[in-house]
Amino acid sequence: MEQLLHYTWKHRLLPLTELTTTDGRRVEIIDPGLHNRNAGPDFFNAKVKIDGTLWVGNVEIHDRASDWYQHGHDRDPRYDNVVLHVCEVVDREVQNTAGHYLPQMQLSVPQHIRDNYDELQKTDQYPPCYRIIPDLTRLTVHSWMAALQTERLERKTDDIRRRAERCGGSWEDAYFVTLARNYGFGINSDTFEQWALNIPLKAVDHHRDDLFQIEAIFMGQAGLLELDTVPKHYQQDALNDGYFAKLRNEYQYLAHKFSMQPMDAARWNFLRLRPQNFPHIRLSQLANLYYQRKAGLSQLVECTTIDQLKTLLSSHVTPYWETHYTFGSLSAKNEKHLSYGSLNLLMINTAIPMLFAVGRHRQKEELCDRAFDLLEQLKPENNHIIRMWQQCGLPVMSAGDSQALIQLKKEYCDKRDCLRCRIGYEYLRASR
């Protein structure tokens, strides 16, 4: 398997016997080079000594030497700087575009690495590397968690950057879309993002001082001001209480004024949702947040502490929703503030990644550093992923740790990408 051969070369998991080319010249690996995952040679800028002469260039790796021709490398000038061709089976000589024969070296994947890799790929246990985790050094765990935490923030930065592009380059709008997405808290996240992209924020800004009009636009664009979206047994009550009709009339006026089109309300998911998470409640909280001018990027960037972030993101519903979860359904009075857990998730998934992304965009490292510091101050998430890692023996002390472990599961374990994982590395090289 070529991937394992790459791995053996990259990590110098080499036999103890002397390495030689197929024509008997001694090979010494000074630097295996930089692993290239894109088009071109497999390793850039490697340093190898062949019969005492130092060669600096690229290394290409194949299962069989004849793959050189099958892949067309003999006609590709990008491979002219290859100084060593490494193969498990050397079944022929190879030449570059200039007709020069390349030095070749036979290399086999050590049997224990092959066996360990098969275990990782075939076991039904999850995570497959669970047996080795208690034996990992603190340094290994700490350095890997730090790298994963950065990866997680970088991935979220890419998402935010794409939203900014969809918003015509507006990072202010991208923040609103990101905030709205995370108000979906998983089940309705995609729908909230679609909804936010359908909100003409420049138009809404003209009515920013009127909470009722903001809520009318937010509810209307969500498609929730059509009578057939109200459960049948509540429709008459919704018409009688007056608020539904007032919002609908206001929205119809504003929709005509700003040429707005509502989204399809069928996109909203109500199944298995607690009433506290119903779209009506979250939209009212968002309207209040927007009305209080707490949904802006400039306010976020000014936050330097967890308490300031909590104050910024805290919101509650408008008076009607204190006694309702949907139109027409009367309930006990409750101001419906965002819970502590919801605030925590908004800080972890919205505010802190946005600080990091803005830091990258503006080349302000202090904002990136602040994002890391804030993550370390927050309590970790409590979900099935985190509990799984805790049972395996990994420490979870902060939101930084929990984000790192979510990244580990989603980007490595779920994809069985053990060859890029540092825990996988420890598992593969262990002799058992």
Task: For each feature predicted by the language model, list its residue ranges.
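Low-complexity, highly charged intrinsically disordered N-terminal segments
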Residues: 1-4
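Cysteine-cluster motifs in flexible loop/terminal segments that predominantly coordinate metals
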Residues: 403-432
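N-terminal ordered "arm"
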Residues: 7-64, 79
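Short linear interaction motifs
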Residues: 63-65, 402-403
